[in-house]
Amino acid sequence: ISVDGCTSTNDAVFFLSSKKVPLKGKKQLDLFSKKVKEVCIKLAKKIVEDGEGASKFIEITIKGAKTKRQAKKGGFALANSNLFKCALYGENANWGRIVAALGQAGIKVAENISIKATSLKKKQVSVIVDLKKGGFQHTIYTCDLTPAYIKINAEYS
């Protein structure tokens, strides 16, 4: 996840265990792991939804990457791009912002790149970028940057 690309001590999730209830067998461990992942995803989304001044929740999926690392790098390049986040706040489908952010991250973008998004007018926006270079993908959760974000951080004391 990324709200503004900055690390904050205010948004954290801790997972603690007393080890008092042992997990028995692979089936129990798999179920426990699945449920922990579900809770972590819900908490991650909640942190983004509660981002300072955020008006939109944005799910970015980079697919068709050569490697998992490239997919993750591409996702964070968009999630941390002020120009991309401002364009989404303005409901402006300026896909040049996406290509520029990927290029800045060192990802070569082919001419046949595919970019799709749900309606930018909605509170929840999904952006899918297909690099068409391989079989890896990664999803990042972020939010837009708004005038309220600037106001909150300009007046911070």
Protein language model annotation of sequence segments:
Residues 1-157:
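A structural signal for small-residue-enriched, beta-sheet-centric alpha/beta enzyme cores
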